Amino acid sequence: MAPRPPTAKPQESVTFKDVAVNFTQEEWHHVGPAQRSLYRDVMLENYNHLVSLGYQVSKPEVIFKLEQGEEPWISEKEIQRPFCPDWKTRPESSRSPQQGVSEVFLRTNVLSHTTIGDIWNVAIQGHQESGRRHLGPEASSQKKITTLEKKIEQNKVGEDSSLSTDLVPQLDISSSIRPSDCKTFGNNLEHNSELVTQSNILAKKKPYKCDKCRKSFIHRSSLNKHEKIHKGDPYSNGTDQGAQSGRKHHECADCGKTFLWRTQLTEHQRIHTGEKPFECNVCGKAFRHSSSLGQHENAHTGEKPYQCSLCGKAFQRSSSLVQHQRIHTGEKPYRCNLCGRSFRHSTSLTQHEVTHSGEKPFQCKECGKAFSRCSSLVQHERTHTGEKPFECSICGRAFGQSPSLYKHMRIHKRSKPYQSNNFSLAFVPNTPLPQGEGLLTEVKSYHCNDCGKDFGHITDFSEHQRLHAGENSYGSEQTLLGQQSLSHPREKPYQCNVCGKAFKRSTSFIEHHRIHTGEKPYECNECGEAFSRLSSLTQHERTHTGEKPYECIDCGKAFSQSSSLIQHERTHTGEKPYECNECGRAFRKKTNLHDHQRTHTGEKPYACKECGRNFSRSSALTKHHRVHARNKLQES
């Protein structure tokens, strides 16, 4: 076996252009969305792997474009020839287009997964140019990507094998280009054990797995870079510090903003000029970037090329897939520097940061009220215009906000619900909504067969079921203050020794016990009033501060308690969840149901101390007291 190549890296002579796969603008426009995603993943891994191996590789423009989501094509004159002068080449006329495409495949897969000293085919890019001249732009771009995909499937190698020159004939690469022809690196390149990494990409293996989110990678360097996201490393987004600190020569004459590349300046200037050169052939809508046009065209075709491997959900944009996958991995890379809270989306972090600054930049022109979010302002403006774009497909009632319609639709009886022992699952037919809103085309409701209450989420429904079952949510034997341990999962282990009332949770029992002891550990600093519960103190303090954090999205009315907001929202949705078992009459508030039930039972718990007359409602007793007050005034 030939000795391994020297470990010294010829850093000064290596640039990323020597190992890159490049497209012209015309070729790039013939590449589909899924193929563009494949190209982006391979190129970024190529660059990141070279940097992780210690090579002084300056960030090229194509990588900068890929990281920014821009189009990575370059002009013909920018495509470079091979850097190694010792490699022999065949005359251009004797080389077929297919051979050039095959070379693209080998270079794409090999160069990004080994050290530069182990790669013999970094110089074949110059040969690709001769093959490119034989192909049109569409054929050239399609052959590059298609051959790349096919060869990955056809040339899978075993786990213990390594890539050597035996693979070269399979890829139809000209025999005039061999590692033995290179006097700079020599024959040592044929027997490099580090090429075993190549088997991972051909076999689609990702042996390096993140312990926190279980995401897998082909290279250890990619894993190391990913782990910085969890650690909060400020340079974990793949930004090259050297490029960041480099000079920006291209300045916008309108706003003074500078850019590293002229193409970036050209695209930026379209913001000022309003130029949108890329127009949709279907609807005529124009865009500043061709990538935006490609994403828009998917809306017409319905194509969703980006599919989640875990749940199968498909998306039109790769960025949407990346954001969706964070739901499965739990990754929240955007962290607030003030409170440490993390978010899956950068927009969510931006909206959250406003809560710290208190800034409300969006102001209503009608009444002057300010909001921290643009969406909140849009919702508020409907209270002035009276616009109600969300209409119920069953009864025709319209609402100003989509959540109000969502809540309203739960009150309708479902014709064919899915029944189970504990709940019903129902769907509202798929009906179009105004302004293209499709979020309400499918409404799921969990219906309790014991009390008839509906829930929008399975977690809320499960919690509600415990009220009927008396189930201990902890699911284990617990004791509190000498109480007996839980002997059955449906028992309430925490029982009050004074009144005998039992509770599922120890915290509920402790709060209840303060009723008997009179303990009120939570005291208001303003007026000195004390409370037995912390939540009661929090609500009381709002009477001093005037804070009303719970705002109705329909009319803008604010409340100091969330329960008050819930009751108020029912005036908009028409929901009446509390139904009388005797006559079927429904009510918005539980207290109204209790008052009504006394008309059936005849109970009158409110007695007048003056005359002894009894009433079923406290409000009726209050009115009655006024009669005695007037009589006393008349007598005096």
Curated annotation (Swiss-Prot):
Zinc finger (C2H2-type): 208-230, 250-272, 278-300, 306-328, 334-356, 362-384, 390-412, 446-468, 494-516, 522-544, 550-572, 578-600, 606-628
Region (Disordered): 227-247
InterPro entries the record matches: KRAB (IPR001909), KRAB_dom_sf (IPR036051), Znf_C2H2_sf (IPR036236), Znf_C2H2_type (IPR013087)
All copies of domain KRAB, residue ranges: 14-85
Chief location bin: nucleus
Known tissue expression: Brain, spleen, thymus, and testis. Expressed in heart.
Pfam families found in the cross-reference section: KRAB, zf-C2H2
UniProt KW Phosphoprotein keyword: no
Keywords associated with the record: DNA-binding, Isopeptide bond, Metal-binding, Nucleus, Repeat, Repressor, Transcription, Transcription regulation, Ubl conjugation, Zinc, Zinc-finger
Cross-link Glycyl lysine isopeptide (Lys-Gly) (interchain with G-Cter in SUMO2): residue positions: 444
Bilayer-crossing regions: none
SUPFAM superfamilies to which the protein is assigned, alphabetical: beta-beta-alpha zinc fingers, KRAB domain (Kruppel-associated box)
MF terms in GO: DNA binding; DNA-binding transcription repressor activity, RNA polymerase II-specific; zinc ion binding
One of the record's GO cellular component terms: nucleus
GO biological process: negative regulation of DNA binding; negative regulation of DNA-templated transcription; negative regulation of transcription by RNA polymerase II; positive regulation of DNA-templated transcription
Assembly information from the UniProt record: Interacts (via N- and C-termini) with REST (via zinc-finger DNA-binding domain); the interaction inhibits REST repressor activity.
Family of the protein in this entry: Belongs to the krueppel C2H2-type zinc-finger protein family.
Function: Inhibits the transcriptional repressor activity of REST by inhibiting its binding to DNA, thereby derepressing transcription of REST target genes.
Name used for this protein in its record: Zinc finger protein 90
UniProt lineage: Eukaryota, Metazoa, Chordata, Craniata, Vertebrata
